[in-house]
């Protein structure tokens, strides 16, 4: 396994560390007669920020085949009579300085109005302005290998120097009209230049921004002990534009626009008052992911490139349940859980963007600390599934490989409700 050439382990773990100590949100509503006007600002989507101090598997996989590539190139030059022996035999180790930091965040400013049609039925209409802010910064530097089984050396420098020496010799043989030796050293120079280019340092520093508007409609029905709410958010057409400062990877050309739609969302919630102090609720969310335009991905079987939405079998489904208990006049406690089920296929998943199904569990409490002021606190954690993706041609290396995606998430929240 190529990864064993760096640290001795065929399987490697790439851990992205993320920390968001403070994510603010603000919500306000003003009621007058049958009307209520509301607004809020919050981080409404995105995967947050993550730093991979050892890079990503898709990056290192290309470096891991360097020892084998050198041995194979040496064998080819021996077969062609360019080299008398394979001077690269014994190359079986490599090292690399790899790093990646990324962020994906969607900020939303929502405004809307609610009208009470009857004593039991209210309707809502609103819009949300979404601003997407993505960023990617990373590098692959100082690729080294134990060429010929010797000490670790910088591969780019080694072959750059090797190419210069071979080119000098080729030019000298050409001047002497020794075409046989010229052809030999010309081939060596070209091959060495190729390897030097493949092992050169790579840098990336790119931001992506874009915006779009989401229309929102909702209905709320309340009678006796029942309360039912339905909301539909329309699909948001949105592109993000690359603002690239450095990119010699060829992946993020400056000025290129990439589809980044926010999928339509249908939510349904039902609550029931079991006792005057005890309420239970259930909910369902469905994201229409297959109708949203997304960035391209390649089908490894057909080689065809198309939007990632074509690799989604079905939209995301979420199932929720919770219960709230009024412990006394000034305190409440609650608990709930959520099951999130994605319908993505292998071609959707990559180590730069992946989705794994999960269970979330949460607990909360509310305290009336003043006549018009309530303090809310909550804690929840998410237990993610593991998604395994097996590839016959891992990272374009020609070698079979496997990725296992998962993550962890823990959140503490605090909020204040003020009535005036």
Predicted features by range, described:
Residues 1-19:
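Surface-exposed strand-loop-strand hairpins of Gram-negative outer-membrane beta-barrel proteins
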Residues 23, 31-420:
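Outer-membrane beta-barrel porins/channels
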